[in-house]
Curated annotation (Swiss-Prot):
This is Taste receptor type 2 member 38. GO terms for cellular component: membrane; plasma membrane. GO terms for molecular function: bitter taste receptor activity; G protein-coupled receptor activity. Gene3D superfamilies: Rhodopsin 7-helix transmembrane proteins (1.20.1070.10). The gene is TAS2R38. Receptor that may play a role in the perception of bitterness and is gustducin-linked. May play a role in sensing the chemical composition of the gastrointestinal content. The activity of this receptor may stimulate alpha gustducin, mediate PLC-beta-2 activation and lead to the gating of TRPM5. The chain crosses the membrane at residues 18-38, 56-76, 95-115, 143-163, 191-211, 252-272, 277-297. InterPro entries: TAS2R (IPR007960), TAS2R38 (IPR030050). It is found in: Membrane. It is a multi-pass membrane protein. Glycans are attached at residue 178. Residues 39-55, 116-142, 212-251, 298-333 are cytoplasmic. Most taste cells may be activated by a limited number of bitter compounds; individual taste cells can discriminate among bitter stimuli.
C-alpha cells in the first residue's frame, strides 16, 4: 500500500537549486511586468491619453509585480525560515493571505480585459447588448478603480482579522493507516478556510471571464464564416484583432488554471503532509505562470512590441559603437 512520506527538511543542494530558480523566475517576471508598466506609465508622464486596454494592462502589471514579490518572499521563507515540522509562522501566513488577495485582483483585471475585448470587437445586434458594451467602454476606469479599492479593503480586513485574533494552538492527533500522525493546528485550519473563502470569491470574476471569452470565440467563428462567403482576402484587421485577443485570453486561462491547481495542491502539502519539496515545486509553478502571460501580452500588443524593438535596436547600436571604439583604440596603439 502506498503511503505519503513527509519531508520536513530538504538538503542544501535542493534548497540552493530552488532558491536559484526562484531568483530567476522573480527576475524574469519583474522585468517583463515592469516593462509593461513603464511603457504605459511613460505615456502618463508625457500626458498622452491611455486607451482602456492600456489602463487595464497598467493595473495588471502592478498586480503581477506584487504577485512575484510575494512568491519570492514565500520562497525565501521556505528555504530559510519556515520549518514544516513546526506550525506555520505568522509572516509566512501573512504572505500567503496577501498572495491570495493579489491573485484575486489579478483575476478581476483579466475579466475586465476580456469584457473590454468583447465591447470593442463583437458586433452586437440586440439593443441591450449594444448599450451594455457601450457602458463597459465608458466605465472601464471606474471598474479598475473599484477593483483597486476592493483589493485594498480586503487586504486591510484580512490582515486586521489575522493579527487581531488570539494565536493559541490546539493540537489534535489524527491516526491514519494506524501509524501516521498528523498534527492539525487551529491556525492552519483558519488559513485553510481563508484560502477556500478567497477562492469562492474568485468564482464570479472567473465566470465573467469565461462568458466573455466564449462570446468572443463565437464572434470569431461567425466572422470567419462571413469572410468565407463574402471575401477571399485573408488579411482582415477585425480577424487579426479577434485572434490576438483570443490568444491573450486563452493563454491567461491556461496559466490561471495551472497556477490554481498548483495552489490547491500546495495547501494539503503544506498543512497536512508537510512535504517541503512538493510545496517548493508548487511555488515554482505559480511563479512561472504570470511571467508567461506577460510575455504573451507583449507579443500581442503593437505598442509594447515597438518598445521592445526600440530597446533592441538601441542595445545593438550601443554594442556596435563600443566595438568600433575598441577597434579604433587598437589601431591607434
Amino acid at each position: 500500500m502506498l503511503t505519503l512520506t513527509r519531508i520536513h527538511t530538504v538538503s542544501y543542494e535542493v534548497r540552493s537549486t530552488f532558491l536559484f530558480i526562484s531568483v530567476l523566475e522573480f527576475a524574469v517576471g519583474f522585468l517583463t511586468n515592469a516593462f509593461v508598466f513603464l511603457v504605459n506609465f511613460w505615456d502618463v508622464v508625457k500626458r498622452q491619453p491611455l486607451s482602456n486596454s492600456d489602463c487595464v494592462l497598467l493595473c495588471l502589471s502592478i498586480s503581477r509585480l506584487f504577485l512575484h514579490g510575494l512568491l519570492f518572499l514565500s520562497a525565501i521563507q521556505l528555504t530559510h525560515f519556515q520549518k514544516l515540522s513546526e506550525p506555520l509562522n505568522h509572516s509566512y501566513q501573512a504572505i500567503i493571505m496577501l498572495w491570495m488577495i493579489a491573485n484575486q485582483a489579478n483575476l478581476w483585471l483579466a475579466a475586465c480585459l476580456s469584457l473590454l475585448y468583447c465591447s470593442k470587437l463583437i458586433r452586437f445586434s440586440h439593443t441591450f447588448l449594444i448599450c451594455l458594451a457601450s457602458w463597459v467602454s465608458r466605465k472601464i476606469s471606474q471598474m479598475l478603480l473599484g477593483i483597486i479599492l476592493c483589493s485594498c479593503i480586503c487586504t486591510v480586513l484580512c490582515v486586521w482579522c489575522f493579527f487581531s485574533r488570539p494565536h493559541f494552538t490546539v493540537t489534535t492527533v489524527l491516526f491514519m493507516n494506524n501509524n501516521t500522525r498528523l498534527n492539525w493546528q487551529i491556525k492552519d485550519l483558519n488559513l485553510f478556510y481563508s484560502f477556500l473563502f478567497c477562492y469562492l470569491w474568485s468564482v464570479p470574476p472567473f465566470l465573467l471571464f469565461l462568458v466573455s471569452s466564449g462570446m468572443l470565440t463565437v464572434s470569431l467563428g461567425r466572422h470567419m464564416r462571413t469572410m468565407k462567403v463574402y471575401t477571399r482576402d485573408s488579411r482582415d484587421p477585425s480577424l487579426e484583432a479577434h485572434i490576438k485577443a483570443l490568444k491573450s485570453l486563452v493563454s491567461f486561462f491556461c496559466f490561471f488554471v495551472i497556477s490554481s491547481c498548483a495552489a490547491f495542491i500546495s495547501v494539503p502539502l503544506l498543512i497536512l503532509w508537510r512535504d517541503k519539496i512538493g510545496v517548493m515545486v508548487c511555488v515554482g509553478i505559480m511563479a512561472a505562470c504570470p511571467s508567461g502571460h506577460a510575455a504573451v501580452l507583449i507579443s500581442g500588443n503593437a505598442k509594447l512590441r515597438r518598445a521592445v524593438t526600440t530597446i533592441l535596436l538601441w542595445a545593438q547600436s550601443s554594442l556596435k559603437v563600443r566595438a568600433d571604439h575598441k577597434a579604433d583604440s587598437r589601431t591607434l596603439c
